[in-house]
Amino acid sequence: RRQRQMCIRDRFDDVTTEQFKSAVDDLQKQGITGLVIDIRNNPGGVLKTVADMLDYILPNGLIVYTETKSGKRQEYSGSDNHELNIPMAVLVNGNSASASEIFAGAMQDYDKAQIIGTQTFGKGIVQTIRPLTDGSAVKYTIAKYFTPKGQDIHGKGVTPDSIVELPDDATEDVQLKAAVEYLNGKMSVSAAE
């Protein structure tokens, strides 16, 4: 059984999509049968980046949408005709925020991965920064985002499918262990079918 762990630690930035696609392609060439994607402590990043990554994993269809206070809706949909069909687990925690929650929420809505860990942060808003003439800037909210099934994450977060606490004094990563056990169980079932 060959499963691998992929960490997206820092944030979803402009280069993350190509790095992700390249890593997934390399792992598939190696014959992986399961994948753990670790977005614990990932504060988020660029909405388009996470949408492009999800487009590579999910079937064609709605990935995420944003809605302004006035009701204007913008949809991000999958269209690249690529879908990753291996058992997956996504690790999250209370420091998984914003784009990380979009990722986890979409994977959960499409039932593409088991979400494992603790409740995510709950930052379901899109913000922008406007520079001021004195050199300072103002950051303000322009929209809320929603998962494909319309889940509003703001102030609530994403609830994992399997809640697994990771105590500060833990000597092993029990969340990662739970993900590997989940994948081993999924692969045993598919091998028996």
Which positions does each model-derived feature cover?
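Short acidic, Pro/Gly- and aromatic-enriched capping/linker segments at domain boundaries
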Residues: 132-134, 138-143
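Short linear motifs in exposed loops
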Residues: 141, 154-156
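Cleft-lining beta-strand/loop regions that shape enzyme active-site pockets
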Residues: 1-5, 9-123, 127-130
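Short, acidic, Ser/Thr-enriched surface-loop or helix-capping motifs
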Residues: 147
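Conserved functional hotspot residues or short segments at active or partner-binding sites
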Residues: 153, 169-170, 174-193
